[in-house]
């Protein structure tokens, strides 16, 4: 079981708590983080990944790749701290709250949840909110 976090930016983030939260979400959804890599980066890297792998030439908050199926998750996700910062100011949520929301969102993608379509998006948001409410105890 391996969960690795990498911060490619100069910004300080709560890596230990992020690791606990990501692991908690994956396990609470009935999965095991066999090999999971979380990369916290800037706009330039996530835009390049978005362009090369998804054909979208813009920065986004997160991109998730799942490499297998079954209960043991092998995958990775990228989170743009630049987009997190912009969105936290735009939605007046605070940087850390937005960071944890997107990390939870990414973990849910690894667990197989999709957010394409209104109903799926609403279901994912409900799960995100539930896990966000658990943050103080994690």
Curated annotation (Swiss-Prot):
GO cellular component: cytoplasm
Keywords of this entry: Cytoplasm, Endonuclease, Hydrolase, Metal-binding, Nuclease, Ribosome biogenesis, rRNA processing, Zinc
GO BP annotation list: rRNA processing
Cofactors named for this entry: Zn(2+)
EC number(s) recorded for this UniProt protein: 3.1.-.-
MF annotations from Gene Ontology: metalloendopeptidase activity; RNA endonuclease activity; zinc ion binding
Organism domain of life: Bacteria
Entry annotated with the keyword Nuclease: yes
Location in or out of the cell: Cytoplasm
Cofactor note: Binds 1 zinc ion.
Positions that bind Zn(2+): 105, 109, 115
InterPro entries (UniProt xref): MetalPrtase_cat_dom_sf_prd, YbeY, YbeY_CS
Keyword Iron among record annotations: no
Protein role: Single strand-specific metallo-endoribonuclease involved in late-stage 70S ribosome quality control and in maturation of the 3' terminus of the 16S rRNA.
Family listed: Belongs to the endoribonuclease YbeY family.
Name of this protein: Endoribonuclease YbeY
Origin species: Chlorobium phaeobacteroides (strain BS1)
Protein encoded by which gene: ybeY
């Amino acid at each position: 079981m391996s969960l690795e976090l990498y911060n490619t930016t100069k910004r300080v983030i709560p890596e230990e708590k992020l690791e606990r939260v990501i692991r908690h979400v994956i396990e609470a959804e009935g999965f095991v983080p066999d090999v999971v890599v979380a990369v916290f980066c800037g706009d330039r890297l996530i835009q390049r990944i978005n362009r090369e792998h998804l054909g979208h030439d813009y920065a986004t908050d997160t991109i998730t790749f799942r490499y297998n199926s079954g209960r043991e998750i092998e995958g990775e996700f990228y989170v743009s701290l630049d987009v997190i910062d912009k969105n936290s100011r735009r939605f007046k949520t605070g940087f850390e709250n937005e960071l944890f929301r997107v990390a939870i969102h990414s973990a849910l993608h690894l667990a197989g949840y999709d957010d394409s379509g209104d109903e799926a998006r609403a279901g994912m948001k409900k799960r995100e909110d539930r896990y966000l409410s658990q943050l103080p105890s994690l």
